[in-house]
């Protein structure tokens, strides 16, 4: 991953629409290892476009910076200051956000340490 000092990330990246009401801004990415860090922003009332849980092939860490996020399958809501660490293969979601949320997310390939 590229090294940066403090800066305004919007000078290097923009918000990209993932699905209605859900946007991502990639802060840094290593295309060789698959590792990346990003911000994900959900508008109030946003929900996953799928009704099935997500399963990734990478390790995912999520910190809720502000707002709320509800796991619809578990019927459990998570709030500002909460953190998740998910190993590859862990089912989670689908999600909805009543008031909207902003999350800091990192994705790490399970074999990135071998390179």
Regions found by a protein language model. Give the residues of each.
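Glycine- and acidic-residue-biased ligand/ion/polar-headgroup-sensing regions
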Residues: 50-72
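Short, well-ordered beta-strand segments in beta-rich or mixed alpha/beta enzyme
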Residues: 40-42, 63-69, 103-105
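Conserved catalytic motifs of the protein kinase core domain
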Residues: 35, 60, 100
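Ligand-binding loop in jelly-roll beta-barrel domains
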Residues: 88-113
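Conserved short histidine dyad/triad with adjacent acidic residue
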Residues: 26-56, 75, 87-91
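A short, N-terminal "cap"/entry segment at the start of jelly-roll beta-barrel domains
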Residues: 1-36
